[in-house]
Amino acid sequence: MFAIIELGAKQFKVSPDQVFVAEKTGNTVGSTVETKVLLLSDNNKVNIGSPALSGAKVTLKVLEDCKGEKIHGFKYKKRKNYKKSWGHRQQLQKLQVVSISG
C-alpha cells in the first residue's frame, strides 16, 4: 500500500511506517499532521483524485526539526572592489507516516 501526498508545494510517495524529510511545515515536534492525498494504491486497486481524494487521509508524526546542507552564494563586480557572499540552510522536518486510510 502506498499513497502520493502533497505537503507544502511538493509531492511525496509514502508507505506505512516510512520516515522521510520534507520542508518545515510549521508544526511542533511530536504533533500529528493530516495531508492531502492525490493518489492511493492498495495492491491492485488504484484511486486517483482530481486533484485530491475526498475520503482518504494520511496521518504524519513530526519526529524532529533539522536543517539541510549549507548553500553558499557569491556576488562580485570586477574593478569596483565589490564582493558579497551569503549562506542559506533550509529548515527541514523529519516525518513518519503513522497511518494511511481511505
Curated annotation (Swiss-Prot):
List UniProt keywords, sorted A-Z: Ribonucleoprotein, Ribosomal protein, RNA-binding, rRNA-binding
Q: What's a GO cellular component annotated to this UniProt protein? A: cytoplasm
What are the GO BP annotations of this UniProt entry? translation
The superkingdom of the source organism is: Bacteria
- Molecular function terms in GO for this entry? rRNA binding; structural constituent of ribosome
Q: Which InterPro entries match?
A: bL21-like (IPR028909), bL21-like_sf (IPR036164), Ribosomal_bL21 (IPR001787)
HAMAP family given for it?
A: Ribosomal_bL21
* Biological role stated in the UniProt entry: This protein binds to 23S rRNA in the presence of protein L20.
Q: How does it assemble?
A: Part of the 50S ribosomal subunit. Contacts protein L20.
Name the protein family.
Answer: Belongs to the bacterial ribosomal protein bL21 family.
Q: What is this protein called?
A: Large ribosomal subunit protein bL21
Q: Taxonomically, what lineage is the organism?
A: Bacteria, Pseudomonadati, Spirochaetota, Spirochaetia, Leptospirales
